[in-house]
Amino acid sequence: MIHSLFLINCSGDIFLEKHWKSVVSQSVCDYFFEAQEKAADVENVPPVISTPHHYLISIYRDKLFFVSVIQTEVPPLFVIEFLHRVADTFQDYFGECSEAAIKDNVVIVYELLEEMLDNGFPLATESNILKELIKPPTILRSVVNSITGSSNVGDTLPTGQLSNIPWRRAGVKYTNNEAYFDVVEEIDAIIDKSGSTVFAEIQGVIDACIKLSGMPDLSLSFMNPRLLDDVSFHPCIRFKRWESERVLSFIPPDGNFRLISYRVSSQNLVAIPVYVKHSISFKENSSCGRFDITIGPKQNMGKTIEGITVTVHMPKVVLNMNLTPTQGSYTFDPVTKVLAWDVGKITPQKLPSLKGLVNLQSGAPKPEENPNLNIQFKIQQLAISGLKVNRLDMYGEKYKPFKGVKYVTKAGKFQVRT
């Protein structure tokens, strides 16, 4: 299936490659680099690229491209899902999936890739099994390995490999038993010039951190589970129970994992938490223009909207901008023509604004279109869809665990047209 894997940074450097069958030359990545140059943004590089002798299937994660080389036709989503699993494993092992972390742990990276794929086909992808096969790096283990010449590869086969619940290792014991859940929702929206919503959708995930002894059986119920669409489950979820009762019933993996991801596609259920008043104008046959935007809370359910940033890709004829913010600070890059306004948090009592003059190239024609505003924000302790966890029940063990739920709403691709 997968012949080779190349890891490429944003500068276009191939800093790691792994081959499972015959060695594929790095020159095959030239097709990927051509597609990258044509793409308007790094996230818009086609995930599947056809070449005369290969298929290149890639993902973009944490400023890195994972590019796999395929010689026969396979379902692309299958390969994409596996590449995401590789990135998740690096994140779990090293704390971050970055070029520096991968280079610092390059031996463990190759050991993991060797275990995750057998002759190019997925074999062991569950984190609990991999951690029994290959021990996660620690400072003490690194020192011992350098002195003794040993490796992080385990001496025994993982106990869960042949189990009917391979995602959980046996003999788990904790002094403090805890079960925490993070409900994280991202709003993707397009707002037109008049402030009306053209498109709105919520992408949500529930991430779990489970540190429970033994073999607990958990049931997680919600106040309003019917609003969820296109739910994707971790393999531990009993799907029939969800279909009949809308309850998540599962024996959890040990540690951190993604329990479900979901979508709320009904625009009536998507509350837009911020509004933007804008006035951007360029005069014909003039070397200046006006820029005026104000941002405020709209539907925040009584919570504070924080971490607000506004990014604007100005037209190429813009030379400079002389603006005055009532809150926060702004920067303008005259080379990339990108205006970035770091607002911070907002309250209804004081609405932040950014206004001033725009300097244009002398004699240049008036820009045909006004720029779009890209908004980023975060709201703590709020799931904007209204999703709420009702209760968590545990069976099979007699102790009482600590339980907690945290809600976060943030902007995904949130665009305001001017």
Curated annotation (Swiss-Prot):
Biological process according to GO: anterograde axonal transport; anterograde synaptic vesicle transport; clathrin-coated vesicle cargo loading, AP-3-mediated; intracellular protein transport; intracellular transport; melanosome assembly; platelet dense granule organization; postsynaptic neurotransmitter receptor internalization
Subcellular location: Golgi apparatus; Cytoplasmic vesicle membrane
Keyword Transport: yes
Alphabetically ordered keywords of this record: Cytoplasmic vesicle, Golgi apparatus, Membrane, Protein transport, Transport
One Pfam family recorded for the sequence: Adap_comp_sub
Domain of life: Eukaryota
Gene3D superfamilies per UniProt: 3.30.450.60, Mu homology domain, subdomain B
GO cellular component, one term: cytoplasmic vesicle membrane
MHD domain location: 176-417
Membrane topology designation: Peripheral membrane protein
The keyword Nucleotidyltransferase appears for this protein: no
CDD domains: AP-3_Mu3A_Cterm, AP3_Mu_N
Single Gene Ontology MF annotation: small GTPase binding
Assembly description: Adaptor protein complex 3 (AP-3) is a heterotetramer composed of two large adaptins (delta-type subunit AP3D1 and beta-type subunit AP3B1 or AP3B2), a medium adaptin (mu-type subunit AP3M1 or AP3M2) and a small adaptin (sigma-type subunit APS1 or AP3S2). Interacts with AGAP1. AP-3 associates with the BLOC-1 complex.
Family stated for the protein in its record: Belongs to the adaptor complexes medium subunit family.
Main function: Part of the AP-3 complex, an adaptor-related complex which is not clathrin-associated. The complex is associated with the Golgi region as well as more peripheral structures. It facilitates the budding of vesicles from the Golgi membrane and may be directly involved in trafficking to lysosomes. In concert with the BLOC-1 complex, AP-3 is required to target cargos into vesicles assembled at cell bodies for delivery into neurites and nerve terminals.
Protein's name in the database: AP-3 complex subunit mu-1
